[in-house]
């Protein structure tokens, strides 16, 4: 199976290729379009370089969208989905709900899978937590994210937290209160019977869920987990998670709006 990749600025192109190398043989990243980072081309000689995203899609069995700029994902996902090519949309899935909704709806309409977001959500540990989440009145999720990052502000790393929140707790939140002080972002996400507190700082730290105890989440083995998930989605053994990601983008929008007040 040949996976095409669009986007080469982030390290995820290499991370995902390394992840595929750890899985049973039979799939690899072939064509790559690096329109977002042409300066990376000299280091990409082990891939088949394409000049356009359309060329990548045509010569691939499925597509990885690896752009840091989430607002570019929807148009590219549309091209792939209309050609019947399953899509993995890297984080951030989108930067507004309308674009996220469009990808989810087109996936449903075409019957072509669309999935993606933070690969931490696909680790066995998170699957186990989803299946047997301790019952608490309050939870806290913490991870690193810089609201002033040159890589798309809080969208790029903050989407880990919104993806994890909607993965673990669903999209049924009814209110969000967010604030930023000294680059520390905190958001209170209110559900009918409990609340989830999201907290990020720019410094390097592992992702942690605080519930009945502290759960250290895996942000290293997550790349193979993400690719294993995508391959299962391509084969239609596992459903994509585009609907959940719409909820994540909705949560992201609410947090960003709160930070602007």
Model-identified regions with their sequence ranges:
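A contiguous active-site-proximal alpha/beta segment in oxidoreductase catalytic domains
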Residues: 94-148
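Rossmann-like dinucleotide-binding domain that binds NAD(P)(H)
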Residues: 141-203, 243-250
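Conserved acidic residues
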Residues: 32, 61, 137
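Short beta->alpha connector loops
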Residues: 9-11, 68-71, 93-94, 120-122, ...
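C-terminal substrate-binding/catalytic lobe of Rossmann-fold NAD(P)-dependent oxidoreductases
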Residues: 182-230
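C-terminal helix-rich "cap/oligomerization" subdomain common to oxidoreductases
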Residues: 42, 55, 59-67, 233-261
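Beta-loop-alpha module in the N-terminal Rossmann-like domain of NAD(P)-dependent dehydrogenases
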Residues: 27, 45-88, 92-104
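N-terminal Rossmann-like dinucleotide-binding module
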Residues: 1-44, 134, 244, 248, ...
């Amino acid at each position: 199976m040949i996976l095409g990749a669009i986007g080469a600025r982030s390290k995820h192109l290499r991370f995902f290729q390394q992840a595929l190398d750890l899985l049973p043989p039979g799939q690899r990243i072939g064509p790559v379009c690096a329109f977002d980072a042409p300066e990376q081309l000299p280091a990409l000689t082990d891939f088949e370089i394409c000049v356009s995203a359309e060329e990548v899609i045509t010569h691939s069995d499925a597509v990885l969208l690896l752009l840091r700029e989430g607002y570019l994902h929807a148009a590219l996902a549309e091209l792939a989905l209309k050609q019947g090519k399953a899509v993995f949309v890297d984080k951030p899935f989108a930067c507004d709900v309308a674009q996220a909704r469009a990808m989810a709806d087109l996936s449903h309409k075409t019957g072509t899978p669309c999935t993606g977001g933070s690969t931490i959500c696909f680790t066995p540990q998170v699957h186990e937590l989803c299946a047997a989440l301790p019952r608490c009145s309050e939870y806290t999720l913490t991870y690193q994210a810089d609201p002033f990052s040159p890589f798309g502000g809080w969208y790029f790393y903050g989407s880990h937290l919104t993806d994890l929140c909607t993965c673990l707790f669903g999209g049924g939140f009814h209110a969000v209160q967010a604030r930023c002080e000294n680059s520390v972002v905190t958001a209170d996400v209110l559900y009918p019977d409990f609340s989830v507190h999201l907290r990020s700082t720019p410094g390097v730290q592992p992702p942690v869920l605080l519930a009945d105890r502290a759960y250290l989440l895996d942000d290293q083995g997550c790349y193979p987990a993400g690719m294993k998930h995508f391959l299962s989605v391509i084969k239609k053994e596992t459903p994509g998670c585009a609907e959940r990601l719409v909820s994540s983008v909705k949560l992201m929008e609410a947090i960003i709006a709160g930070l602007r007040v």
